[in-house]
């Protein structure tokens, strides 16, 4: 009789333990996707760009104007004959610099908008493909279509050229990505087996310039490059994904993602979320690479089941949220369920 009771108790404990482990496993991978589309007030459900300002307002660049989202309501800025605050309705890129200042590249050119100050500037010469980015002091730079690096001068309200020392200008068609890291070094990733590091000098003078600091060699041609802070994610000619940290310049092999690109098409963006990675595709959704160091394969793959192309993606600046801009389904807000471990006290 005692043996039977003991076995029942042990069996009960084992079942509870298995149930607890199952709940932990399920919840550790649980996530929520909230969709925001034209039913919620978006002017258009194709999201070309995503940004966020210092007040944590979300900025969605659509095919029909800029949409500013405060978590509840959406305010729309679009170009109309009676309102030329923003020229052009295809919002291709959004960058925030000074408080309240938005830089918006559209199909018509580059707009500077500060609605609080009533300041609206327009630079039609920067329409088309170019690279727009900021340094650690939030000053705006642009690498234009003819290979010129320029910085916006807040005093003159004009762009001025940044000279390039110890290097020839790099053709825009060869560049995959440009960024400043947290040490204000300028990194340029190109299509061949090299990437460059420049230092910036005399920024606040009439003759700013960059000087080539280092040329780094990669063992294969680079085909894609995506910046996320001090991390750069590069994809080589064989669709192998690597991560480079500018803090401790070393190349980390992530995974062979060739089967993903064959299945889902070209990559549109890559971002780091905690220790995991999000990869979006121009024709078919987003996958999450979850770090699993205890397994043979360091990353497991979760498909977020977004069945359309993804044009833009960013990590929230203050919360554990990923904002996903799609081609036709609006914006998805990704959040994770916090899992809890319950403790049980067993008595015999």
Q: Language model features by range: what are they?
A:
Residues 1-348:
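Carboxylate-rich, polar loop motifs that coordinate divalent cations or form catalytic acidic clusters
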């Amino acid at each position: 009789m005692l043996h039977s009771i003991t076995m029942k108790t042990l069996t009960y404990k084992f079942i509870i333990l298995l149930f607890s482990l199952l709940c932990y496993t399920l919840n550790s991978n649980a996530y929520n996707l909230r969709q925001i589309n034209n039913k919620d007030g978006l002017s258009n459900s194709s999201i070309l760009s995503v940004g966020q300002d210092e007040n944590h307002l979300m900025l969605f660049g659509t095919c029909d104007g800029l949409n500013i989202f405060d978590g509840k309501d959406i305010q729309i800025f679009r170009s109309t004959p009676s309102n030329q605050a923003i020229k052009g309705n295809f919002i291709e890129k959004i960058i925030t610099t000074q408080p309240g200042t938005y830089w918006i590249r559209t199909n018509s050119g580059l707009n500077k908008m500060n609605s609080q100050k009533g300041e609206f500037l327009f630079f039609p010469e920067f329409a088309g493909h170019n690279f727009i980015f900021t340094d650690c002091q939030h000053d705006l730079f642009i690498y234009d279509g003819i290979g010129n690096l320029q910085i916006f001068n807040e005093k003159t309200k004009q762009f001025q050229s940044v000279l390039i020392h110890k290097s020839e200008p790099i053709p825009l068609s060869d560049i995959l990505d440009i960024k400043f890291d947290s040490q204000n070094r300028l990194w340029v990733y190109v299509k061949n087996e090299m990437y460059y590091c420049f230092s910036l000098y005399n920024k606040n003078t009439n003759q700013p310039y960059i000087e080539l600091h280092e040329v780094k060699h990669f063992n294969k041609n680079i085909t894609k490059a995506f910046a996320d802070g001090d991390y750069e994610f590069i994809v080589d000619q064989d669709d192998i994904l690597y991560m480079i940290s500018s803090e401790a310049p070393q190349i980390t092999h992530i995974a062979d993602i060739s089967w993903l690109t064959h299945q889902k098409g070209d990559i549109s963006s890559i971002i780091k979320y905690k220790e995991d990675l999000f990869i979006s595709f121009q024709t078919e959704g987003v996958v999450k690479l979850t770090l699993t160091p205890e397994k043979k394969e360091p990353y497991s793959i979760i498909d977020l089941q977004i069945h359309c192309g993804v044009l833009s993606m960013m990590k929230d600046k203050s919360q554990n949220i990923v904002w996903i801009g799609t081609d036709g389904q609006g914006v998805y807000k990704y959040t994770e369920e916090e899992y809890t471990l319950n403790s049980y006290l067993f008595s015999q």
